[in-house]
Amino acid sequence: MNIGLILSGGGFRGVAHIGAIKALEENNIFPTHISGSSAGAVVGAFYAANYSPEEILAFFKTIPIFNLGRYAHNKAGFIDTDKYYPDFKKYFPEDNFDALQKKLFITTVDLNHGEIKVFNKGELIKPLLASSAFPGLFSPVTIEDGLYADGGILDNFPVEPLKLICNQIIGVYVDPISEVESMNLKHSLAILERAIKINFLSDSSKKFSECDLLIYPYHLNKYGLFDKNNIDEIYEIGYKVTQEKIKENKLQFYTK
């Protein structure tokens, strides 16, 4: 039986995916197919390569984001996404989907043609970097003759790759929204992030019904897109909410 796992984008809120995976495994639920966008693609790739939740969490704690040595020069972005290649190469030395232990689908956006592009074979790291290349902040990634960027632009909850091949689907959405006061929307970045989250949720919520189990850690709404200071809290929220949802859900998942 194939169990699919959808991992949404959400910046450092994506660390909640790691806690969710930990809870799933503790309940003997082991997804066989993973579809991820942006931060979800990164977590999904590590999980597909059989890294433990603890190892994935350690990666997120140590990866530098706003580092002077990674600023872009003559590229469309403040940070040069390609400079993260060596960081990922350490964990994915074969740099190929075929080396993974689980089936993985990475959602990106083809900027040249203005459409979704899902990668599931061939080189791994460049699609992974592209899926996480938040527009304007991180430079897009060149793959062959095209430019690719954050998959969340068009699909922040990529269920389509799993619909026809999985018997059961688990979805984890880590980009929730809640009502905010106007005083918290005084800066350009806050307005931009708010607008993006509203758009993402509007599109993603239409797909929630495709999931046999939906994990929606609502309390993540108080954490920012690049909130690296609260990684342990974010992880725990993902873990606890998943444990609660599994107990509530009556569906029997295939277990090892």
Predicted features by range, described:
Residues 1-37, 45-256:
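Patatin-like phospholipase
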